[in-house]
C-alpha cells in the first residue's frame, strides 16, 4: 500500500487561482502549482508546499513556458537542452525541482526520462492520458527516487490513476477549473489508500488479562460503524478494532475515537506499524473499513488510562494472532459478516476480521527475516 501525492494546478491570475488554492488547503493536497507572481499570496493563505516556474517557491518547476511543454523547440541533441542545463544548475545549488513534460511524441518521452534523472519530481501530461507510456519512464527512473505525477483533468482520470498506476506513478496533478471539483478530487485522492486484504479469523480464546495501561486514539475524523483501526500484539496479524461510532445505552457514541488497546500493541499507519504508546497529537493515523478500504486521518489526542484488560486470541490455518483490549462493552471487533461484536461478548468460534502478513517487521517496516512473536 502506498500514499498518492496530490498536487493542484492553480496557475493563472490570482482571481481564478485563489479558490483552487483554498480548496487545496482545505482538502489535504500535498502541493499547489501556481504562477510565479502568486507564490507569496499562497503563503499568506496558509502553510502549503508551493511549486512554480520562477520566483522563490518550495519546488522549482522546469519546463513550463519552455521546452518541456513545447513552448520552445526541443533540440534533437538533448545535451543541448536549456531545460536540462537549468535542472543541472539548480540541482548543484540544492534546489528541490520538478520537471514538467508534455508527452507530444517519443522524443518527449526520452526527454522526460532524462529530466526525471535530474529532478526530484516529474510531472507528465499527455493528450490521451490513458496511453501515457508510464512503463517506459518507470523503468528508466526505477531506483532514482524521482516521484512521478500524472496530470488528471477530472475525477475519472484521477480514479484511474489510483487504480492503474498503483505500482508506478506516485500521484496526480489535478487540473480542473471548478473549485468544488478541486476539493472533491483532492479529498478522494489524498485520503484514500490502496485496498487492504482483510481475512476472517476464528476466535480461540478470550480471557481476563488483569489491569494495565490502554490507549484511546481520538482522531480529527468521524468514523461510521464498520470502520476502525488495525491493532494487535503481532505486527503480522492485526484485528480490525471498530471505532466507538455506535450508540450505547451506557455512554454516548464517540465516532472520532478508537479504544485501541494496551500500550505495547501495534497499530498500522500507512505502510508501517507503530506502538500505541508512541502516538501523539498531530501524528497520522489510518482508518480502515470492513471492506478493507482505507483513508488517512490525523490524531487529535491520545489518552492513556489504567483499565481492566482482556486477552483475545484467534487463528486461521496454522497461524495464531492475539490482542489485549480493554474489558468493556463499547470496545468491538468487526465480525466476518461486517457486523460488530463487543469484546465482552466474544466466544470461541466467533469469526472476526484481521489483516495478516507473511513478513515480520523491524522498526515498523516489513522485512524478510525469521521473527517469532508470541
Curated annotation (Swiss-Prot):
Keywords carried by this UniProt record: Amino-acid biosynthesis, Aromatic amino acid biosynthesis, NAD, Oxidoreductase
GO molecular function annotations of the record: 3-dehydroquinate synthase activity; dehydroquinate synthase activity; NAD binding
Single biological process term from Gene Ontology: aromatic amino acid family biosynthetic process
Catalytic activity of the protein: 2-amino-2,3,7-trideoxy-D-lyxo-hept-6-ulosonate + NAD(+) + H2O = 3-dehydroquinate + NH4(+) + NADH + H(+)
Oxidoreductase among keywords: yes
Xref: Pfam families: DHQS
EC numbers, comma separated: 1.4.1.24
InterPro entries: DHQ_synth (IPR002812)
Entry similarity comment: Belongs to the archaeal-type DHQ synthase family.
Entry protein name: 3-dehydroquinate synthase
Species per Swiss-Prot/TrEMBL record: Methanocella arvoryzae (strain DSM 22066 / NBRC 105507 / MRE50)
